[in-house]
Amino acid sequence: MLCCMRRTKQVEKNDEDQKIEQDGIKPEDKAHKAATKIQASFRGHITRKKLKGEKKGDAPAAEAEANEKDEAAVAEGTEKKEGEGSTPAEAAPGAGPKPEEKTGKAGETPSEEKKGEGAPDAATEQAAPQAPAPSEEKAGSAETESATKASTDNSPSSKAEDAPAKEEPKQADVPAAVTAAAATAPAAEDAAAMATAQPPTETAESSQAEEKIEAVDETKPKDSARQDEGKGEEREADQEHA
């Protein structure tokens, strides 16, 4: 409220001054008045902050200081009005900082825009080297898939190779049994010839020997057949597992 009252008082004073000087108003005077108004508004804003920050007990002191500042500002304004020769020179510095501030802000904005443009460029440059990564991943996945397919394709062939390798030793065992039987057959014939030439006692012994040989010959094919059957079952089991 106090600040508002002060502003109204200053406005009233300015209005009175304008009424008095309606005949000889100059642009320098208008600029000076605008500068004084701006200064008064800034001072009022500062005093408000001080009043809010200070305690209630310190409020009167702050008000007194604000009043003194306002009075000093009014005194300065009157002195400037009295010296008409010095008013244009003083009004120019009052109005000068505003365009400079504007130019400063305008000068900062293009640099900020350039920075903003530089950031997307950097992002695109970073994204460009990172782009080949998906293709490399696809190539790696394709290689792994081809390797797995090759392993699956080779597995039946390896099993097929293992099966003939197992069959070969089994086939080798069968001729061995046949050769053993062929070797025992001449021995049996020789024993029969000896039995015919020898007396009856020897014939009985030879007959027993022949029976033993025949029993052995009969058991060998059975054993070989059993072995062949067992090996055949093993092959079938291996094929089923494959």
Curated annotation (Swiss-Prot):
Transmembrane spans: none
Lipidation (S-palmitoyl cysteine): 3-4
Predominant subcellular localization, coarse grouping: membrane
Outcome of swapping residue 3 to G: Lack of palmitoylation
This protein's record includes keyword Cell membrane: yes
Gene3D superfamilies the UniProt entry points to: 1.20.5.190
Compositionally biased tracts (Low complexity): 85-97, 119-134, 172-204
Record keyword Transmembrane helix present: no
CDD domains in the cross-refs: IQCD
UniProt-annotated stretches for the region Disordered: 1-242
Disulfide bonds: none
Residue ranges constituting the IQ domain according to the UniProt record: 31-60
GO biological process: axon choice point recognition; axon regeneration; regulation of growth; tissue regeneration
Assigned protein family: Belongs to the neuromodulin family.
Name this polypeptide is given: Neuromodulin
Gene name linked to the record: GAP43
